[in-house]
Amino acid sequence: MIILNLFELLKQIQVSPGLYLGRPAVTDLFIFLNGYEFARSQSNVDLTPQEERFYDEFQPWLQRKLGVMSVTSWAKLIMLSCHDEKTGFDRFFQLLDEFNQESIADSLMAA
């Protein structure tokens, strides 16, 4: 399967985290996604608008949602309410779905 964008990759990671991360851990996912963004920039592969939105807006959105103002990573913000990395990993995907749904709703309202 050819992965065409970040969100397709995230679906694959959710299904098979061991293949991509070694274990289902939100901190490892954060590091992986930073590496993915870096590799794309080094290869001159532009992010899609949706991918840019994730990288630019997910952490500020999460801070507002959790009522936490911090410069720490979104992975650490998620871990504030999770007892282990696996729970944080699962929680990330729940939050990502919510973030994407709100972004879609915002786009529809703006149109």
Region annotations inferred by a language model:
Residues L19-G22, Q42-V45, V71, A105:
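Intrinsically disordered or highly flexible coil/loop and linker segments, enriched in small
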Residues A25, T72-A75, D106-A111:
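Short glycine-rich, low-complexity/disordered patches
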